[in-house]
Amino acid sequence: QPITESQRLFSIAVSRVQNLHLLAQRLFSDFESSLQTQEQRQLNKIFLQDFCNSDYIISPIDKHETQRSSVLKLLSISYRLVESWEFPSRSLSGAQRNQISEKLSDLKMGIQLLIRANQDGAEMFADSSALQLAPYGNYYQSLGGDESLRRNYELLACFKKDMHKVETYLMVAKCRLSPEANCTL
């Protein structure tokens, strides 16, 4: 049977987020491998006590809640997660920033198209006015030594985590629209 426009858009969006997630994993891995073992242990301890800016975005807490969420809800959460990275991604180094910014913008546009295609008169962001993300810590200030190291670590770890979430949500949403799919996580 022919592929629908919605399925095609989902395939493109999933491919884009997979690419971003792999990039996030590589950047995080490269950063970790540049650290001394002691530095890495310290950063891991600190990060476990901290949280990501995007934790303010209400999203499913486990795979069961993800499975029960509507396609539109998963798309809206994905959109917010991607949007929440537009500003923080600018604080990365030049090459990383260029790689990520364009990909985020493309992914955001793709998710917007998917939301429009899947809306049944539902409001896209019923509670978006309540979503006011605080600036991403001190990422935009020039930081010295250990603080800068910690911020880079947190930024890359959170970016990796959020791209994994978006990838999961888009894959579940895509699966739901596929007639013969078994959508288990």
Curated annotation (Swiss-Prot):
Gene3D superfamilies: 1.20.1250.10. Its main location: secreted. Zn(2+) binds at residue 167. SUPFAM superfamilies: 4-helical cytokines. GO terms for cellular component: extracellular space. Keywords: Disulfide bond, Hormone, Metal-binding, Secreted, Zinc. The keyword Transmembrane helix does not apply. Disulfide bonds join 52-158, 175-183. The keyword Phosphoprotein does not apply. One of its GO terms (biological process) is growth hormone receptor signaling pathway. It comes from the Eukaryota. Growth hormone plays an important role in growth control and is involved in the regulation of several anabolic processes. Implicated as an osmoregulatory substance important for seawater adaptation. Belongs to the somatotropin/prolactin family. This is Somatotropin. It comes from Katsuwonus pelamis (Skipjack tuna). The lineage of its organism: Eukaryota, Metazoa, Chordata, Craniata, Vertebrata.
